[in-house]
Each structure stands twice: as structure tokens, then as C-alpha cells.
Amino acid sequence: MLSKKYFLLVILVIIGIFFIIIPSGPVCSGEAQCITGKVTKIVDGDTIKVDGTSIRFALTSTPEMYEEKGVLAKEHVEKICPVGSTVLVDEDDMQTEGSYGRMIGLIKCNGVILNESVLESGHGEISTRYCKTSEFANSEWAKRFGC
């Protein structure tokens, strides 16, 4: 009888450890979409496609592709997060759809927040006009660049 109780206790401990160690899914802030997917295209320095869905980097603006600096911004993103990489996209709760039907969000790839990386590298600028309408405006990186 005593060994049966210990057996059950051990099983419960193992189950508890399993739920602590195994993550329950992607971790995002807010209530909007939180998706994990594969990068299918790097459009430019502030837009990628994830499983075919266009994602615009929240609070980040890079030059257009017809400008040399736009090409450099795209190359920067490609180095960190090449096509085929798995990304986590945290959709901006306060901007659930941007221009051209793109989702707007914070993108994490290979341990890097792409929004922040583009700004840190000097390939982009903070979009200050959205600082009052973005969930991410109070992030450390957004504040550092002018939100």
C-alpha cells in the first residue's frame, strides 16, 4: 500500500516537471495574434512574408528598395533571418492591420528582435508617428530609438 502511494507521487512529480519544462507555445504580449512560422520571402528591410502572410516590422521604417540603402537594409535582414528560418510574430495589439493589408508586429528570429536589429544597424529609423499607437512603444528598444 505504501509503495503504491510513492509510485503515484513519483508519477505526479514527473507530470509536473513535464509541464514546467515543455513550453506551452509561443510567448507574446497582449491579445492580438501570436504566430510561429517560416520566412517565405524577405520583401525589404522592414517587411517579410511568413507562410505567405506579409508582416511589417512595427515602429520600423527602412529606405525603399530602389535606393541603395534599402538594398542594404534587406541584406541585413537576410543575414540574420534567411528564407526558411522560423520566426515568432507578435502582432501589434494597437495596429492590427497596416497599409497594403500587412500584419504589423514584433518579429523574433534566431534570438534577435528584427525590429530592433534594423534600427541598431543604422539601416532603419524609428517610426515616431506610430509611437502613440503601438503596443511596443514602451519597449526598451523603441524608447532607446526615440519613442
Describe each model-derived feature in a short phrase.
Residues 2-147:
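Small beta-barrel nucleic-acid-binding modules, primarily SNase/OB-fold domains
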